Every structure is written in C-alpha cells, then in structure tokens.
C-alpha cells in the first residue's frame, strides 16, 4: 500500500479505540455492571435478507420484532465475508484480513486480546456451542487459546437427529443451548455463553418449508429458532440479569446480483436484548463494525479495553469520527455518515466513492497495512 510510514502511523493513532478518554460521555445502557452475556453469531444473516419480504410476509419476523424491542444498531457492518474472520473480529476485536485468516495461525491468534479472557479475569465462566465441527478452520484451538473454558460441538452432542452437511440443525441446537444458559444461570459465577448457528449456511438444507427460495427458506428457519430461544430465555429466571447480543458472522450476496465488494453486501444486523438492559426500543445510528463490539461491551460494564487497539467504543468520545470497515479479497471498504469508499488493492483503484472528499481512503489503507504488520510481529 502506497502510504508513507509516518503518515500511516499518525492516522492509525487517531483511529485507535483505546486512546485516553475513549469512554468519556458513554451513556449507560445496562442496569448491572456484571450482566450474564449471551453472544449469538448468526450464520450469513445479511441485512438485505433481514429486510426482505415475500408477498408481504417478512423473511425474518423475529429479528424484526427484536429490532423494535431492543437496542438496534442501524449502520453496522461485518469485517469480512467468512465465518472464521468474523469470529475473530467479534470475539477479539481484531480486523479481518483480505487474503488470509489469523485463526489458522494458532501461535499468532493465541496472542490476541479476547472478550472471553477479559471477562475471565472478572470471574466469568465461559462456554461456546456449535452444532458442527469446531475443528474446521482451527476454531477449537482458537477458542481455547483465547480464553473460552468449555466448547460443546457436534461430537459432544450425539443426538438422535438428522444432520446436514455442516452438522445438527438449529432447532435441536438452540434447545441444548437454552439448557446450557439456564444451567450456567443457576451457578454463582457470572457467565459468557456463545452460540454459532449453522442452518442458514449453504446448501440451505433445513427441515422447513415456508418459502420456495432455498436461501430465504433457510434464513426463515434460523430466524424461527432464534425466536424460540429468546422467548424461552425471556420466561426463565436467567433473563433478569441477561444481556443477549445478536450479530451476524458476515453478510450474504442478496439480491443475488449484489457485488461481492459492495458495502451493502457487508451490512449486517446487531441487536442487544435482555433484562440487563436499562433502555430498550432504542436505535443507534453510529457507523461501526464487528471489531467494535469488544470495546463497546466492556465499556458498558465499566471494564478496561486497553488491549483492544482496533476496537472502538461505539458510544465513546474518541475517536471522534466513527466508521464501518470491511475487507474482501484484497480490498477494503470504509463507510461513515458522509459516504463510502471501496478500494481494490490489487489494481490500486478506487472502485466506488460517494459523499464529500474525506480521509476514508487513507483510513482504510492504514487499517489494512497496520493489521498485516501487527500479525507479522506476533
């Protein structure tokens, strides 16, 4: 990337989420400093699909319901187009890469800061569940090395239920996950519980028949299971001190002609729900992306996030200019309230730019170059 080192470091320093005063002015969204946290990664839940209707019927009625009930992040973006890179962004606040995945480099990924490790220092237990194979893309090694205590996946479940290409369908897995959350809630320690769904992954094989389009039908199935899970937890004693974070692992190219590098391809939902919230039915318009979850959540709990260089507190005072950032195959996009810039690094070409001239191009170059230099040092 053709950006001078001194200028790059100056820009990068301005974009750091852990600068002094980063949490100044942060509004309090939680009733408790130590809520139990449920973090659900929703496979391929692109924003365009969430907003879709078929003959007037919403594809994701439960997500639409939760959007109205909880804290809704209107301008939120995935950092990548793959689950493994999205997981690292959400769980470690570390930016995705264009042509590699740090998750597959265990000695390097083990050095990343992580939400599980930060909460573990505060006495939190942690458990993560997935209905498929957590050895895929080295997920299990990554999860253990970044502080998750307990992993539950397909090999542990041994269910009398059919499996798809990727594992057990979401309907049976959310029931097990509900059991796990309620069991953790009966213990004295606070907890962090994570779930990665899978039924909305292609080839979209689900025990469900609502829409003719296989993609939309699978998305509707997963939405229905998340709706059942949230409604179950709402009726459980665990709900009173529970914060549920619903966020996609990445988006999906829908409509089917949506360009792979378009900002809309990477726009995803994020919703906060639960009895631990002091506020509800709130819309957050700030531009942000998956890497900002760690700092935002830790700041709400009054905990430090100094380790997370790239993660910005969405509600904090610094950096003053908030934006969403994503990577595609050797390129990046930066989106803020003024417009968007999409850059192809291979061709050294700005593919699209809207809004007034800004520093978005330099921000993106600094983020991408700094990410790779950081990985090289680990």
PLM ranges: what are they?
Residues 13-378:
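Solvent-exposed soluble domains appended to multi-pass membrane proteins
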Residues 1-11:
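Single conserved hydrophobic/aromatic residue that forms the stacking wall/gate
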């Amino acid at each position: 990337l053709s950006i001078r080192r001194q200028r790059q470091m100056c820009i990068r320093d301005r974009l750091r989420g852990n600068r002094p005063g980063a949490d100044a002015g942060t509004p309090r969204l939680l009733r408790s400093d130590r809520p139990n946290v449920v973090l659900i990664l929703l496979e391929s839940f692109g924003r365009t699909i969430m907003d879709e209707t078929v003959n007037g019927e919403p594809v994701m009625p439960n997500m639409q319901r939760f959007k109205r009930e909880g804290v809704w992040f209107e301008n939120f973006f995935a950092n990548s187009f793959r689950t493994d890179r999205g997981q690292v962004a959400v769980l470690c606040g570390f930016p995705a890469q264009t042509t590699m995945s740090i998750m597959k480099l265990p000695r390097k990924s083990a050095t990343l800061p992580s939400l599980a490790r930060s909460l573990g220092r505060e006495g939190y237990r942690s458990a993560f569940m997935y209905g498929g194979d957590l050895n895929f893309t080295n997920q299990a090694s990554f999860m253990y090395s970044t502080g998750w205590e307990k992993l539950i996946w397909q090999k542990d479940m041994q269910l009398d239920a059919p499996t798809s290409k990727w594992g057990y369908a979401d309907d049976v897995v959310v029931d097990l996950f509900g059991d796990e959350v309620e069991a953790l809630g009966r213990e004295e320690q606070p907890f962090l519980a994570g779930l990665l769904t899978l039924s909305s992954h292609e080839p979209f094989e689900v025990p469900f028949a609502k829409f003719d389009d296989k993609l939309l039908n699978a998305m509707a199935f997963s939405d229905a299971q998340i709706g059942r899970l949230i409604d179950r937890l709402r009726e459980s004693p665990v709900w009173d001190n529970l914060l549920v974070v619903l966020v996609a692992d990445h988006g999906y190219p829908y409509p089917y002609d949506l360009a792979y590098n378009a900002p809309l391809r990477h726009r995803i939902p994020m919703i906060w729900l639960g009895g631990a919230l002091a506020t509800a039915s709130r819309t957050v318009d700030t531009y942000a992306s998956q890497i900002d979850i760690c700092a935002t959540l830790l700041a709400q709990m009054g905990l430090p996030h100094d380790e997370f260089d790239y993660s910005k507190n969405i509600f904090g005072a610094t950096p003053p200019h908030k934006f969403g950032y994503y990577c595609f195959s050797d390129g990046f996009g930066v989106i803020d309230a003024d417009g968007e810039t999409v850059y192809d690094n291979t061709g050294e070409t700005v593919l699209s730019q809207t809004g007034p001239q800004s520093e978005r191009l330099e921000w993106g170059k600094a983020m991408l170059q700094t990410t790779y230099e950081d990985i090289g040092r680990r």
